[in-house]
Each structure stands twice: as C-alpha cells, then as structure tokens.
C-alpha cells in the first residue's frame, strides 16, 4: 500500500511535466503494479513476527509472481523535460524481483522534496512503506524516479529512465535500483567507482510493512528508523502534502537523492548535525479518491538539529532612490529698489561757523574802461593782516596809479621792471653771468655792464620804437659772435645768443637772427643751420659747398682731413662702424690709439671727445653687449656740412673708379641728396617770405664793418681752448677776414669733393689720407 501511495503521488507530480502519451503509459504500468501488489500475503503473521528473516514463497507462488512480473514489466524509459544528467551511470530502473529472498533488498524508496522547500539536513528521509505478502513484495520491486522540471543532476550525459525486469532471482538481488533525485538548480555528486550497493534491513522493513498492513491506525515509524545507515544509504526528502479544496495536490520542486559512496569520498553535508523527524506524526483524513485501505499521513515535521541557529535572512538592499529632480532656478525679479539709504543719525554740524567780520563780497566781474585811472573806493583800506598768496602775480599788463604805495614786504615778481632812477653799484654784475676763475685779472667790458636805459627798455608794457638801425647793430654783433663760436666747431645754443647778445630784445629776437643770417650769407658765404629742433642747436656751414668749409685753410685742416676718411669708413660699412673696425682701418694708415701724432695729437681723445663734441661723430654703446662695445656713426653736423654723395665721390676719385660701381651706396646717397634738395628749397622759400615781411634787404650789408669790437670775453673757459693766450686770437682774425672776401675770390664750383682755396695743403692732405685709408673699399 505504501508503494501504491508513493507511486500515485509520483504520478500526480509527474503529470504536470510529462506528455499525454507518457502519462497514459505510466498510468497503465502503475495500475498493473497495484493489482499485483494487492495480492494476499502468504504468511502475514510470520512476516510480522520475524522482521529480520522472511520465509521464501513456495514454488507455485514464485511461478505466479514471475508470470505477473513479466507481464507488467515496463518497456519505455522516461526523461524529465529539460533535465540534464551529468554522469555515465545515472540510470533509473524500475525492477521487479522473483525471489522472495531478495525482496528486502529491493525495497523501493522514493524521495520527494516540495517546491521551494528548504531541506533541513542531508540525512532526513521519509519512508512510507508497508509490509505486504511475500508475493506482493516480490512483485512490487520497481522503483520510480522523478525529477522536477529544469532539475540538473551531475551523474552523466547517459542517464536514462528504464523499467527493467529481472528474470533471475540472483540477478534481481544484484539489480538494486539507484534513483538519485535532486531539486531544481541543485547538484549531486558524480558516482564513483567504489559506490556500494544499497542494503536495506529486511527485518525492519518487513516488520514495519506488516504493522502498517494489519493496523492502519499505527503511527509512522520514528525518524531514526527511517534514516539510512552510514554504509551508503540514500537521503530522501519527502514533500509535505496539503489538502486544498478537497483535492490532494503535491508539488515536486526540489528532490534531492544522493547516492552514497564510501565514507571517505562522500561530500560533507552543508549544515552541521543530523536531521530528525518529529516523535509524534500527525495523521489526517484520507484525501478524496484515495483507496480506503491506505492510511494517509502527513509528513513528519522537521525539527532544528542540535546546534542549529537561524541564520539572518539576507535583506534585500534598498532600492536606489533617484536623485531629486533639478529645480528650475527662480526667475530674476526686479531688483529691490533702495528704499532707505544709510543716514547718519548724528551728522557733524558746525555750531559756530567762522564768520569774517568784514567779508569781501564779490559783486561780479566789472569791466573797467580805463584801468590806468583806477582809484580806490572811498573808505577802503587794506586789511591789517592781509598777505599776498605765495604764488600770486598780478596781471602782466596792469599798472597801478602813479602814487600807489607798495607795502614794505611786498615781493616783486622776477620780471618786474626796475625804476629808471634806481642807482646801481659800480661793480654790479648779474648773478647768472659766467665768471672765469681769473676774473680778477680781467677787465670787464663796458658792453657787459647793464645801463639804466637798457633796463628801462626791457619793460614789455612800454611801447618800443622799431629802430631798424638799432636792430641791425645787434644783428651785426650777433654775426661776429656766431663766427667766434663756430671757430671752435662747437654748436651754438639759442639760449646763449639770447643771453649774450640779444638780451633785452627778446621780443624781436627772430628778426635779429634773420638779419644776422642775411649778413652771413651775403658778406661771408656762410649759412646758419639749426641742426637740432629740440635743443635748438645752430652751426655755421659754408655755401654752396659745405666741403669747402670742412677743408678750409684753418689750423684744424689735418683733423678735418682725417674726419673725411672716418666718415667714408662709416658709410661704406653700413652707416655704422664698430670701434675695432675703425681702429683697424686707421692702423693701416699708421695711426694707432695711445700714440700721440705730431699734427693730430691724441687720436683716441680726438675721435671720442672732440669730434663728438663738435657733432661730427656720434659715439655710442652697442645695445646688449657684454663686455660693452662701442660704435661710431655720423653726427648731426656731418649731415649738413657734407653729404654721402660727396664722400662717395671722394672715395671713387681716390681709387680712380666710378661712384656707380657701389650700387647700394650710390642709390642711398642719391636718395639722401634728393631729400636734402627738397628740404633746402622749402627752407629758402620760408626765409625769403620772412625777409620780405621784415623788410630785410641789401641795406643790411651796407656801411662800414669792423672786427675791433669782438668780445673774446664771451667765450667760456672750455670754448676758449687755445684762446687762453691773447696771441692766439690773431688766427681768428685772419680766418674771419678770409671768409669775408671768400665769395669774391673763389667761384662756386662742383668739380669734386676736394675743393679749397687754390689747391692748398688741406686738399692734398685729405687726398693723401684717402689714398691710404680707402684702399680696402671694394
């Protein structure tokens, strides 16, 4: 009966997964097995009394059993849908024995595990078996193995479900069925070579079957007896049965059947301890449709093994919360208007403001028709503590009444005209006039002493009569002063002309300078040139050929000849020549720095000091040079006294070549000559217009001319140089008179750069220097 109940439960669990044909064939086979198993036992009393040793059936009974078993043997193998075996020996056999002696060894064992049920031990097995007769036990020796859907076994790929029948009793004893079951997604151990055959205690099974058959009310055997022995028994898990709406349902989800092997090769259990069933089974009513002679029992309740503790259930991690949605920033609203500005609670208030006792109230601007007739208002007096502001000056054209008394501490402005009747000490000299160190040995010139009349004429407010004769006299004096200054080749400053010669005629100094230029051009053939517009520096150059002025018959003729050679070296080296290059060219001429020349003197001082001071050369440091290096360039005076074209012609004449042989230098010199012609034409036009406006004509050069009134004392100590000796002034007189008659004696010619008075020694000296100094020019 237990076998029938087990087979029926297995059928209900398998019908959900098997096909229709397999289900029909399985039902037919099970019904035949049930009919055979319901045969009356031969000796029930003996089987119940002696569970350890069962009596074999007679020969006739054995023959009947063999015939029935042969007829009921199934021929088809079933395989659970989507099940996978992982071992070569995973064969599920449902066999039937013919020998009564082998019946105890072929007791069927079915292990079931409910769906999603948790096993509580590897050794907990539920056996629902009932002892039957010898024929029944012998006939019902088939074991059915079912596996849940998608369950996986690790027995091998050749696992099949066979319903076999043994024809020999001995073969039946050795054909012990092996039905491993395993739950979904669980794994069983692969069988090994030393797997032992299953041994079932015949006595215990016979006794328990006999008790269940005779007395349906007897409770189920204890869990300890239901467990298999340690020598290789299988662990079976039986799913609990529930009655829902009067129908018996059974869910097979996880069936674990583990084939037992030797003690050394068996896998260790997952949990410690052994599983034991409850001591008192609970019985329930038979479900509808169950046979009346079958006692329906509920599965034994599981108890926790010794030492077992509930494990903390794995908590589901909290769902990840999505970040809060980004909020739209608030729209910009109108800015809050400033309602209440900060107001000082206690502003500082002057309690007693200073009040002038007699404030001067300005009535408004008053236009006085006659400022000279200004009279004090009646009753007006100067305040006693009144002082003039430190930087205050009166209007330039305002004069007070003739009887206006000046305060005793009233400061006079620096340009205030002195009264005409103020007496001057006999030895009074202005503080800004230069005094030489040996001024005690010098006799001051009467022209240097200011006269009362000259001081009175400096009054800008007084109407100055335009005396042409007086202006021409100052212009002639300025001509002599310029020629004296230019004799030393030092540029002349405008401030020096105003201080030394023009003096009180500062308001008409442009006319005096223009008259002096007219005299220089018409009488001496010299032109006054302003070479620096910022510092207002002037030089004198000869017209129309400046080179004649450079190579004139003066005491500096050798120096100016050397200067012409130096200008050529600079021009042919790209308008600049380093100090090393220039000294190398001079060494080839026999001139060495540090060696004093009989005509030129100290060469280094001549090049780096005298020529630089006279603005013939420009001596400067090379930028970013370490150690410092210096180079030479053309000075401002050189551009006006000569030109690049004249220097290039001089070099070509010395080497007997054409100036156009040096194309780059010739084009540069030609461009400069054209620019100079344009500038000279514009300047000549401006001067002609100014002279017409001022009324300057040929009468300016008429009349006697004398050099006796030249004031040598106007030269400074540095400018005098060789003029410290009075006898050295004689060459200047000759030089001035030479220029006075130069225009009438020498015609204007452009024959070449070497132009001088009748082929004098200056031309020959420059030519000799050039022949030696320009041999390197190619």
Curated annotation (Swiss-Prot):
Tissue expression notes: Expressed in bone marrow stromal cells from both multiple myeloma patients and healthy donors. Seems to be ubiquitously expressed.
Bias type Low complexity, positions: 377-397, 440-455
Annotated segments matching region 22 X 6 AA tandem repeats of W-[PQ]-X-P-X-X: 296-444
The UniProt record lists the keyword Phosphoprotein: yes
UniProt GO BP: circadian regulation of gene expression; negative regulation of epithelial cell proliferation; negative regulation of protein localization to nucleus; negative regulation of transcription by RNA polymerase II; positive regulation of apoptotic signaling pathway; positive regulation of branching involved in ureteric bud morphogenesis; protein localization to nucleus; regulation of apoptotic process
Stated name of the protein: Melanoma-associated antigen D1
Domain of life the protein comes from: Eukaryota
GO molecular function: identical protein binding; transcription coactivator activity
Residue stretches of biased makeup (Polar residues): 104-118, 185-211, 225-240, 253-263, 300-319
Ranges: Sequence repeats: 296-301, 302-307, 308-313, 332-337, 338-343, 344-349, 350-355, 356-361, 362-367, 368-373, 374-379, 380-385, 386-391, 392-397, 398-403, 404-409, 410-415, 416-421, 422-427, 428-432, 433-438, 439-444
Entry's Gene Ontology cellular component terms: chromatin; cytosol; nucleus; plasma membrane; protein-containing complex
Keywords, sorted A to Z: Biological rhythms, Cell membrane, Cytoplasm, Membrane, Nucleus, Phosphoprotein, Repeat, Tumor antigen, Ubl conjugation pathway
Record membrane topology: Peripheral membrane protein
Lineage: Eukaryota, Metazoa, Chordata, Craniata, Vertebrata
Region ranges (Disordered): 41-60, 78-123, 182-333, 376-412, 440-466
Pfam families: MAGE (PF01454)
Function: Involved in the apoptotic response after nerve growth factor (NGF) binding in neuronal cells. Inhibits cell cycle progression, and facilitates NGFR-mediated apoptosis. May act as a regulator of the function of DLX family members. May enhance ubiquitin ligase activity of RING-type zinc finger-containing E3 ubiquitin-protein ligases. Proposed to act through recruitment and/or stabilization of the Ubl-conjugating enzyme (E2) at the E3:substrate complex. Plays a role in the circadian rhythm regulation.
The keyword Nucleus is annotated on this UniProt entry: yes
Residues where Phosphotyrosine is found: 92
Domain MAGE span(s) in chain numbering: 471-669
């Amino acid at each position: 009966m237990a076998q029938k109940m087990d087979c029926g439960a297995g059928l209900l669990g398998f019908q959900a997964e098997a096909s229709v044909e397999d289900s029909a064939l399985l039902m037919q086979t099970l019904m035949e097995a049930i009919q055979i198993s319901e045969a009356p036992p031969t000796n029930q009393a003996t089987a119940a009394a002696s569970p350890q040793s069962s009596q074999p059936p007679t020969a006739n009974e054995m023959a009947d059993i063999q015939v029935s078993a042969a007829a009921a043997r199934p021929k088809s193998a079933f395989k659970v849908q989507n099940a996978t075996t992982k071992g070569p020996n995973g064969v599920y056999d449902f066999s039937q024995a013919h020998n009564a002696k082998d019946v105890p060894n072929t007791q069927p064992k079915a292990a079931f595990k409910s769906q999603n049920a948790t096993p509580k031990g590897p050794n907990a097995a539920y056996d629902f078996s009932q002892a039957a007769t010898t024929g029944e036990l012998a006939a019902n020796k088939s074991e059915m193995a079912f596996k849940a859907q998608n369950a996986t076994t690790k027995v091998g790929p050749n696992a099949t479900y066979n319903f076999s029948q043994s024809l020999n009793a001995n073969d039946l004893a050795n054909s012990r069925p092996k039905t491993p079951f395993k739950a979904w997604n669980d794994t069983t151990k692969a069988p090994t070579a030393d797997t032992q055959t299953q041994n079932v205690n015949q006595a215990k099974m016979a006794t328990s079957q006999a008790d269940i058959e005779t007395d349906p009310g007897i409770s189920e055997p204890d869990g300890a007896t239901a467990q298999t022995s340690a020598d290789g028994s299988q662990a079976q898990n039986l799913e609990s049965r529930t009655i829902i709406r009067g129908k018996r349902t059974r869910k097979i989800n996880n069936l674990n059947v583990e084939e037992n092997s030797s003690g050394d090769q068996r896998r260790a259990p997952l949990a410690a301890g052994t599983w034991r069933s409850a001591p008192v089974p609970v019985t329930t009513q038979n479900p509808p449709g169950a046979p009346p002679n079958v006692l329906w029992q509920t599965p034994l309740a599981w108890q926790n093994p010794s030492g077992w503790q509930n494990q903390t259930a794995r908590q589901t991690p909290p769902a990840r919360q999505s970040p809060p949605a980004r909020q739209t920033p608030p729209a910009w609203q109108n800015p809050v208007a400033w309602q209440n500005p900060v107001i000082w609670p206690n502003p500082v208030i002057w309690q007693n403001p200073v009040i002038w006792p007699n404030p001067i109230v300005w009535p408004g601007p008053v236009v006085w028709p006659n400022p000279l007739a200004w009279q004090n208002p009646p009753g007006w007096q100067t305040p006693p503590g009144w002082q003039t502001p430190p930087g205050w000056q009166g209007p330039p054209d305002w004069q007070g009444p003739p009887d206006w008394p000046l305060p005793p501490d009233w400061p006079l402005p620096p340009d205030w005209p002195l009264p005409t009747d103020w007496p001057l000490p006999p030895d009074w000299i202005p503080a800004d006039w230069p005094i030489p160190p040996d001024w005690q040995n010098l006799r001051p010139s009467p022209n240097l002493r200011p006269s009362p009349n000259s001081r009175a004429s400096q009054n800008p407010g007084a109407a100055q009569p335009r005396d042409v004769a007086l202006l021409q006299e100052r212009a002639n004096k300025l001509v002599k002063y310029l020629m004296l200054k230019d004799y030393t080749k030092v540029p002349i400053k405008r401030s020096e002309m105003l201080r030394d010669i023009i003096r009180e005629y500062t308001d008409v100094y442009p006319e005096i300078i223009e008259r002096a230029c007219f005299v220089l051009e018409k009488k001496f053939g010299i032109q006054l040139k302003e070479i620096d517009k910022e510092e207002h520096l002037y030089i004198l150059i000869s017209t129309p050929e400046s080179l004649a002025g450079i190579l004139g018959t003066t005491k500096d003729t050798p120096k100016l000849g050397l200067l012409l050679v130096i200008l050529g070296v600079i021009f042919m080296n790209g308008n600049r020549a380093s100090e090393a290059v220039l000294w190398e060219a001079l060494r080839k001429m026999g001139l060495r720095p540090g060696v004093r020349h009989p005509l030129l003197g100290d060469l280094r001082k001549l090049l780096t000091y005298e020529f630089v001071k006279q603005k013939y050369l420009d001596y400067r440091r090379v930028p970013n040079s370490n150690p410092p290096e210096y180079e030479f360039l053309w000075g401002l005076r050189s551009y006006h006294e000569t030109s690049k074209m004249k220097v290039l012609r001089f070099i070509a004449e010395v080497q007997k070549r054409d100036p156009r042989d040096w194309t780059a230098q010739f084009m540069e010199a030609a461009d400069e000559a054209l620019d100079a012609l344009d500038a000279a034409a514009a300047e000549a036009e401006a001067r002609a217009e100014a002279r017409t406006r001022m009324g300057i004509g040929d009468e300016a050069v008429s009349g006697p001319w004398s050099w006796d009134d030249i004031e040598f004392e106007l030269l400074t100590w540095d400018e005098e140089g060789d003029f410290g000796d009075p006898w050295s002034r004689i060459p200047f007189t000759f030089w001035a008179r030479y220029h006075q008659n130069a225009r009438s004696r020498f015609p204007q010619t452009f024959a070449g750069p070497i132009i001088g008075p009748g082929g004098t020694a200056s031309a020959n000296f420059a030519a000799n220097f050039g022949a030696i100094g320009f041999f390197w020019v190619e």
